[in-house]
């Protein structure tokens, strides 16, 4: 722009880049197979957790404590079994069987 006000002659309609810019990324990634195995192992470990189950003996009604290591999904399956036909028996009652 020349002067205080823009004019039509100052506007350039035919614009072309002055230099060609290579936008290709030539970066290469390292082999990540080892990382994938490590990550999946940590995920499997994270899935497993310790749970303490406190319930009553189905015969004498005494308190029975169980500690299990399980995934949350498998814990829900066990919960369904305990709410159904599966019964827990205390050590004293199991000796009398």
UniProtKB/Swiss-Prot annotation:
Zinc-finger keyword on record: yes
Zn finger intervals (unnamed): 57-93
Domain of life from the UniProt record: Viruses
GO molecular function: DNA binding; DNA-binding transcription factor activity; protein domain specific binding; zinc ion binding
Entry keyword annotation includes Repeat: no
UniProt entry keywords in alphabetical sequence: Activator, DNA-binding, Early protein, G1/S host cell cycle checkpoint dysregulation by virus, Host cytoplasm, Host nucleus, Host-virus interaction, Inhibition of host innate immune response by virus, Inhibition of host interferon signaling pathway by virus, Interferon antiviral system evasion, Metal-binding, Modulation of host cell cycle by virus, Oncogene, Transcription, Transcription regulation, Viral immunoevasion, Zinc, Zinc-finger
UniProt subunit comment: Homodimer. Homooligomer. Interacts with host RB1; this interaction induces dissociation of RB1-E2F1 complex thereby disrupting RB1 activity. Interacts with host EP300; this interaction represses EP300 transcriptional activity. Interacts with protein E2; this interaction inhibits E7 oncogenic activity. Interacts with host TMEM173/STING; this interaction impairs the ability of TMEM173/STING to sense cytosolic DNA and promote the production of type I interferon (IFN-alpha and IFN-beta).
Protein known as: Protein E7
Job of this protein: Plays a role in viral genome replication by driving entry of quiescent cells into the cell cycle. Stimulation of progression from G1 to S phase allows the virus to efficiently use the cellular DNA replicating machinery to achieve viral genome replication. E7 protein has both transforming and trans-activating activities. Induces the disassembly of the E2F1 transcription factor from RB1, with subsequent transcriptional activation of E2F1-regulated S-phase genes. Interferes with host histone deacetylation mediated by HDAC1 and HDAC2, leading to transcription activation.
Family in the record: Belongs to the papillomaviridae E7 protein family.
Organism listed in the record: Human papillomavirus type 34
Record Pfam families: E7
